[in-house]
Amino acid sequence: MSEERLALSVRHVTSGYRDGGVLRRKGPYQEVLHDVTFDVRYGEILGLVGESGTGKSTLARTILGIVKPESGQVIHYTKRPQMIFQDPYSSLNPAYTVEWILEEPLRIYGKYDKAERKKRVRDMLERVELPEECLAAHPAELSGGQRQRVSIATALIQRPKFLIADEPVSALDVTIQAQILKLLKNLRDELELSYLFISHDLNVVYQLCDRVLVMKAGRVVEQGTVDEIFDHPQQDYTKQLLAAAE
């Protein structure tokens, strides 16, 4: 992993919402992120941890461009990031087959003929270790682990280099979690990916991530390598999170 090449830079970002949500422009402004600065290095998995309501999801939406920062910059050094969602039950359209779901981004955004789309879909299915029979299945016919593999394949089908994974294993049992974490790490190595991995589960973060970003009340209060954060935390808040996970 290179420490010099970056996948993403977030510089002094302050961001939030108007009352009524993301799209409403009227009403008082509610600041959620406060002067957030960090980098995601090319090829690394950066964990993002913090209690519910600390701004993790707002940060993800700001990076994706769904929420516009009031100040600061989000600088992408690769293609626009794609998202792996927490809940594969709701993120996959139940009306369509896996093949249709995987082909749809290529139909909309790519310049590929039918044969090229079919080949890329099958290649991606192999990458996420699913049998070809899954192509004809609807999401409801798959297990939770298989659905999450389809979600990962959907995020990767346009060949991005940076993924935001928002609690991607929290809905899975422990055995399947371990398999998905291994898959994510293998895909990182094989495809030279970078991840921002959002999780409330510090044990999962410890297993998967290279560095960790700790957020409290919309601010980054600590960041460092996994060993630095888990073995030598500096902030009381980080120590509290670690103690609660024991």
Residues of each region from the PLM?
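Helix-to-loop junction immediately C-terminal to a conserved catalytic motif
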Residues: 64
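Conserved ABC ATPase signature
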Residues: 138-142, 146
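The feature captures the beta-strand-to-loop junction immediately N-terminal to the Walker
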Residues: 49-51
